[in-house]
Amino acid sequence: MSSGLFGWKVECAYDPDRQGLMDMPSDRPHPMLTRRAFSVSLLGAAAFPFVGRAFAQTPSDIRSRIAGMSQLHAILVQRGEESIVAEAPRGPGLDRVANIKSCSKSIIGLLTGNAIAEGAIPSIDATIGDIAPSIIPANATPGVEDLTIEDLLTLRAGLESTSGRNYGAWVNSDNWVSFALRRPMVASPGGRMIYSTGTTHILGAVLAVATGKNLLEQARAVLGQPLGIEIPAWTRDPQGYYFGGNQMAMTPRGMLRIATLMRDQGRFDGDQIIPADWIDQSTQAHTRSPYSGLAYGYGWFLSRSGFVIARGYGGQIIAAHPEKDLAVAITSDPTSPARSG
């Protein structure tokens, strides 16, 4: 498969968002789906004529290629301030919200940086026991009180995943946070990456307690209002905590603004929205996916070709390449694994 302009592909496996049966990493190739992997490189090749001069294709040629990708709903590519591609061959369009699936984890990462910058959380090394002891159940796994913000943000809590075969039991439990904090330790905290939406949900609850604002309020205040992004309410757990790490929704244009924020060191329209040093920390490799081998920062995958990527089931993508001055947003059919073009 050609690497194209973007030089990376996304292989999406089953995710919890639809049937609620499983929740697998958005970068994990499912053994039955590998040949149907969604190739972002094709989209890169489609956009390349506007970015470089490698191919002599007309805009109609590019639109034809995009239209031929049956699962693709929308794609926006921006270089600098120039719109390279803005197409929505199907789906709700560019200006109506779409479920961004596990791209939500990357949004939680940005909210974490803001909470630290504002002093609601003292540092990345602060622990659950220090910040939000009230969320820890009496029968929690010993040691969870010492889990740090960084452990949660990098999916290195060491707790057994709530994803995969455990997902159904988790979301059908009467307390999602307690369920996740009662999982046995299967690795040392701060050790290997264990993809688990439950870990990000714990972080979301910690953010809510630490800031005194729920995730919806934080998302709207930190990102929605400054960037002009519509962020509707999404799923809440039985205790009222917004789902941390899944089910958020944005328009494709809103997703593109998040991408430009990452590309431009946390700046948007001349304002510093997220501290630049947090963007730097977020785009450093803190661990590595055991499935794709990609490095993982503070909620963002890091491609070998230089892209910073938020990924969600079915082909939901927010990506930035600072060196190439590129910002990308892609939405796809959220009910099916992504396919190649």
Protein language model regions, located:
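N-terminal secretory signal peptides
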Residues: 1-33, 37, 41-48
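Boundary at the C-terminal end of the N-terminal hydrophobic targeting segment
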Residues: 54-56
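Active-site-proximal alpha-helical segments within enzyme catalytic domains
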Residues: 199-206, 246-267, 316-333
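A short, well-structured edge-of-sheet supersecondary motif
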Residues: 63-93, 318-319, 325-329
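Active-site helix/loop module of the DD-peptidase/beta-lactamase fold
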Residues: 118-157, 182, 210-250
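Catalytic-site signature segments of enzymes, centered on catalytic residues
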Residues: 88, 95, 163-246
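Active-site Gly/Thr loop motif
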Residues: 230-231, 276-328, 337
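Active-site SXXK
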Residues: 81, 99-124, 152, 203-207, ...
